[in-house]
Each structure stands twice: as C-alpha cells, then as structure tokens.
Amino acid sequence: CLERSMSTTTSHALPSGAQPAPRSSVLVATSAVAAAGTMLMFGMLAMWLKFRDASPLRESARGKMIHDWLPSEIKVPEVATNTMAFTMVIACVMAQWAVYSTRRNDSSHATMALAVTAFVGIAAINAQVAVYLQMGMGLTDGPYQTMFYAVTGTMLALLVTGVAFSIVTMFRAVAGRLGDSSVMSAHALYWYFLTAV
C-alpha cells in the first residue's frame, strides 16, 4: 500500500522549472572595478580642482585676475593628448566588435578585434609617455607637477590593466572559448570605463 501511494504522489509532481540564467560574475566584478576606478579618478580630479582653486591670484596679460596654478614654463602638448583621446574611442569600437563577433561565434574576428584593442591601448600608453617626454618636467619640481603625475600616472596604470585584459581575453578567443560572451562584454565595459574617465 505504501509503494502505491508513493507512485501516485510522484506522478502528480510539478515539472522542473527552467534552468536559472548563468551567473555573470566576470561582468559584475568588472562593473565593480569600473565603479571603484571612476570614484578613484573623480576623487583625484576633485583634489586637482581644490588645488587649482587654492592657488594664488595674479593678473593675466589681458588684465584679468586668474588663478596662478599652471607654471608659465609648462606647456601641455595638445597633439599627443588629442590623439590619445581619439584612440580611446577607437578602442571602444574595437571592444564592441569583439562582443559582436563572439555572439556570432566568429573566433577570427573576435581575436582580431581584441588584438586591435590591445594595440590601440598600447598606442594610448605611448601617447601618454610622449606627453611626459615633451613636457620635460620632474615629479618633484613643484605641486602642479606632483598632481599632474599622480592623476596621469593612475590613468596610465588603468590603461596597462586594460591592455592586459585585452591580451588575456584575446588568448581566450584564440583558444575558441567563445561560448560565454560575458567575458567579452566585461572587456568592452572596462574599455568604456577607461574612455569615460
């Protein structure tokens, strides 16, 4: 009698539900890193603005009172800085192309997009080094120089991690591990973060 009641109850059981969505811990972790990096960079820029606001006033060549925060002998090379800004936009396009190729299971295009992203990241690092060399100032030459190297050095470190992320993700694409697109999406998110800050 007991066997009969057990078979009856199992025949009336509900079917199993749908499988839960796969967890995208890489994407969540990258989002957390991007949020922390954004807070870091905006905190550093807030300190920069506070430093600039606390600088003494002087009369400009036009007769207006301005903050004397940038030493007169320092000139920021605009070509290298504008080139760096433009290359960051290209890196975002290439990172998104890698996501697009991954969703279509196209390993060769995903690999090429990631290689170009890494190359463009290296170009941005090169542009920052060119800015350092053209400006020709030392880290301890004054408060402006120290703040400049602190902010740009932090961004340079973030760029190096972006290039490393691109290379590791590229090796994953070369191996044909394109089943989960969350790694590529996390990679693209990181490059969006780098471009935004």
Give residue spans per PLM region:
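...captures the hydrophobic TM-helix bundle architecture rather than a specific catalytic motif
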Residues: 2-197
